[in-house]
Amino acid sequence: MSEVELKPVHRIALGIEYDGSKYYGWQRQNEVRSVQEKLEKALSQVANQPIAVCCAGRTDAGVHGTGQVVHFETTSVRKDAAWTLGVNANLPGDIAVRWVKDVPDDFHARFSATARRYRYIIYNQRLRPAVLGQGVTHFYEPLDAERMQRAAQSLIGENDFTSFRAVQCQSRTPWRNVMHINVSRYGAYVVVDIKANAFVHHMVRNIVGSLMEVGAGHQPESWIAELLAAKDRTLAAATAKAEGLYLVSVDYPERFDLPKPPMGPLFLAD
């Protein structure tokens, strides 16, 4: 065997934050910008060998992340500062490594995850924002966040989310277990916070689109429960825009002991 083949392989996990505004989603694609492509390029420069990453959840074009988790394997030995500060020095300003952790061989960023948590931020004022405009979704009609909160509670538990599932979704089943969903107002901002074991394609944005109809008074509070029972995507509201959506946290078994930095984004407390 060669000397290279004898080198031990290390599995490393990273926490990643990114502004998805200028990317065609997380996943590497030919001829378009992706978060994965930029991260793998920066990691490969630091490792001095090709690096491929696996992520906890592939976000769509325009969607952001403050709590994305990835893992990769390498024979390169580097200090933690190289995998954080060094990689960040090679990344564009809208992508950053938040933490690094050596993990055992049975850790997998996607398959070891037990839950994912998203936050959707709505800027609820008559006129659009100029600052952070790509990090929020503007909705000009007044929203009743308390009404939205009450309506949303019908989604908690294990349910068939066909009514909130994109037509092109490739998941084998529409059943998901929603652990919590909370709608809160912070001044001009309405935040929808939802955690589930996993999500079908566009599930959060489809739920938010329908909740905004309830919050604006266009539909009764009971409408969300009716949509869930109907199992018909055509009856629900339009998909909410990507700009306001953030993957903020991914849960793993405690034995992996991964860091838990503040979820955010920005001023939002855990």
Swiss-Prot record:
Tagged with keyword 4Fe-4S: no
EC numbers for this chain: 5.4.99.12
CDD domains registered for this protein in UniProt: PseudoU_synth_EcTruA
Keywords, sorted A to Z: Isomerase, tRNA processing
Binding residues annotated for substrate, in chain numbering: Y118
Site (Interaction with tRNA): R58, R78, R110, R126, F139
Domain of life the protein comes from: Bacteria
GO molecular function: RNA binding; tRNA pseudouridine(38-40) synthase activity
Disulfide-linked positions: none
Keyword Isomerase carried by entry: yes
Family matches, as Pfam families: PseudoU_synth_1
InterPro entries: PsdUridine_synth_cat_dom_sf, PsdUridine_synth_TruA, PsdUridine_synth_TruA_a/b_dom, PsdUridine_synth_TruA_C, TruA/RsuA/RluB/E/F_N
Region of interest called RNA binding, as start-end residue ranges on this chain: 107-111
Catalytic activity line of the entry: uridine(38/39/40) in tRNA = pseudouridine(38/39/40) in tRNA
Active-site residues, record numbering mapped to chain: D60 (nucleophile)
Region (Interaction with tRNA): 168-172
Any GO BP: tRNA pseudouridine synthesis
Quaternary state and interactors: Homodimer.
Similarity comment text for this entry: Belongs to the tRNA pseudouridine synthase TruA family.
Classification via NCBIfam families: hisT_truA (TIGR00071)
Function: Formation of pseudouridine at positions 38, 39 and 40 in the anticodon stem and loop of transfer RNAs.
Name the record gives this protein: tRNA pseudouridine synthase A
Source organism of this protein record: Enterobacter sp. (strain 638)
